[in-house]
Amino acid sequence: MEALGTGRDRTSQASATESLDLRRLSTRADSAYSSFSTASGDPETRTPSPGTERLPYLDWDYVRVVWGSQSPTSKDAVLSTTQRPVQAVAGHSDPRSPEVQGSPGPLNRQDTPLLYALAAEAEATAHTAEPPSPPASRDAYRQRLQGAQRRVLRETSFQRKEFRMSLPGRLRPAVPTRLPTAHVRSASSSQELGEEEPARTAVPALAAAGRGRLSSQQRQCCFSEPGKLHRVGWSGGPTGEDLRKDYSTQELQRGMHAKSKGLLETQSLSSTELNSGPADLGNAHRPAGRSQSVSGEVMGPCKGSERTVATVQAVPQRADIRRPLLHTKLSRSLTQKEVTGVCPGEALQTKPAGCGRRISETSVSTPGPSLPEDDVFLREAKTPSPQDSQGLPTSTSYRQYENDLSKKAGQIAVSAERPLHETPGITGTEDCGQAVNGSVDLSRPTSIPETTNDDIPTFDTNGTTDPSAATEKKPLKPPPVDVLRPSDSETPGSPHHTSLTWGQFDSKTTWPSRHFEALVQELARLDPSLSRTLAAQPGPEPPQGLLDGLFPVEEIRSAMRPALEEMGEKAAGASEEGSCGHHLTQDLQTSQEASRSENSTPDPDQSSGQEFPEGNSTQAKKVELARLLQKMLQDLHAEQERLRGTAADWTQRNGALEAAVSQACTPRELERFRRFMTDLERVLGLLLLLGSRLVRVNLALARAGSNSDPDERASLLQRLQLLQRQQEEAKELKEHVARREQTLRQVLERELPAEHLRSYCVLLASKARILSQQRSLDDRIRFLKDQLDTIWSDLSHHPLSPRLTWAPAIRPLNKQPFLATLI
């Protein structure tokens, strides 16, 4: 029994051994099996039965190891086991056996069980002599495994189409955690990540304390979600409490991250967000070597005393940070400048110094002929060496930057009533923030750089574009009257108020009628639970100057002037006949603006004619408001379909122009044209998305005021700084796209006739307008649907009035029809 106890540890090791080496056998095995020697040709004598004697090389422990017995066997069993191995061994005593004549090979458990057991004992002894792996080694292996899992999740995570602008995630180098001058290791090389992995695992550890505290409503009400930021400034309610509770956890985590400056920014994706939120856009460190474009073109190495600079920002993991709009790793920009950005005055004056850090920079690079402008997305962000950057400004005002652009490039306004060459003679007599027919056009006076406009300009979605076709068989059609138009705030007289108008909405809520406004105010007074929904506003539009400098204004004006002169008199006559409905401001009116013009005076049957019962007046007013919202949604859907048709027409005209370019230009120039028109849509979408989110945060800051929750305000300021860094990256990208367009336009001016060149200019202007209108329509439709769903949910939880019946024609999708009053 003692032998069985001592050999228990060797059982699993011996049974798990698949191939054993004869050289590791003990001397007892050599003496007991000396007949296996090649020098001995005599057959081995049979080993007698041991009986009650215990052989030195055969005991109960060995028998248990070989045959897997868990308890001592009987005497008969021992006899049978001692005879079976001998017979097996005798069978191998033949001199012709390869096991004997050749070199020692792997042992077989069935053929030589005792020899197998002895070898297992030697193997177990050798394993026992090896020291166990220390805990530090196991921890390092676990950290490497976790790092590999994070890289797999990062590379296979969901990405929006608007953000996939360059290299895939598996090719983006990681930000260095220690020295910014060291080259970035590839994210796919797991051999050299031993130093970085411990730092990366610290980020999830910090957020572990706050895990599970976020409610579903709090996750959805992020700062970048359209239509939800209007709730931030209100005190009380579950939304404000959740936000304050969420930020208290994030503030603690952010304080811990501030102590370790080498941590990576943790980015998460939200599948419930329409466009996903912003993220930090610091300049990722990239080696100054050769880079390869998406199309396969390889660029030359960076020369001179230029180096790359990395910006690392620690962000709480539970904070709702999305993947960056223009990730620095894929930022394909040349320069980096620091701007303060557009925000309310009190927002920047009171923002804490520790909310964020940015690397100020500096180098403004001119378009270089050595690198093709088609690869604008592929050019690395470079900053000069410290000795070269001394004495340069470190900060630039955003408004000053916009004013410089406006002075340099100028702005134009085109309409059907006035030809384009008459634009310098117009003057502004109304405030640039005044709304006309429910929409507003904002023009920036370039003669007063110090002027600040607190009104937030927006993009008009009331109009659409109808670009002219460019084919070889028929001449170019005159540009439509709704492509470019003067601002409504401009009248003839002054040359300072000129603007390239893309179409804009007023940022303030425009009620369709006085009856609608009175109905909303009355319901907010009668039912405070609906005040938050009724007081909300649709998402703001991007600022006006966001697209300034992207297109050459003067060149577009000169190219389109002949066509506008030809159609000037016809358009002016049409406007004199009262065809103001064809004006761009009224071409794409939202249902709110249409109702406002149609219902400028309340109808008797709508305002005073309907006398609801006193006991059910609140419910009847909700029904009436639901009917109005449903009608507005129907009008917006109709305009959305018409805008889709306009976009399809733009695609057709672009194809006709591409066919003309393919016949007149070389294949390389044709490829340049195709890539530019494809990238133009992505760049415009990114600029509009970034601008609208920046305005949304500014509105939330202005609404919150100085008496709001400090944690809430600090969180908004942190979000604002992230957006400002993204805005700086977007400005640099816009400058590169503008240089790329200039190079392409020079080729087209040399190769294409005048009518095709005019068509190209019209396509550029109309594409920006179509995208801005689509974004505005989608946002307003989503906003009205939220209001309609809230009112419908409130109506479904109240008993029906006997004077209310169902209206089959007015009902939301997948729901029962709304109630309508019996008049």
From Swiss-Prot:
InterPro entries per record: ASD1_dom (IPR014800), ASD2_dom (IPR014799), Shroom_fam (IPR027685)
Residue positions, PTM Phosphoserine: 103, 133, 137, 166, 190, 224, 385
Record-annotated ASD2 domain positions: 517-796
Region annotation (Disordered) ranges: 1-55, 72-110, 124-159, 181-200, 270-303, 349-375, 420-503, 566-620
Superkingdom, natural source: Eukaryota
GO BP of this protein: actin filament bundle assembly; cell morphogenesis
Gene Ontology MF terms in the entry: actin filament binding; myosin II binding
Polar residues: bias regions: 28-50, 72-85, 444-468, 489-503, 586-620
Known partners and oligomeric status: Interacts with F-actin.
Family as reported in the entry's similarity comment: Belongs to the shroom family.
Name of the protein in question: Protein Shroom1
Lineage: Eukaryota, Metazoa, Chordata, Craniata, Vertebrata
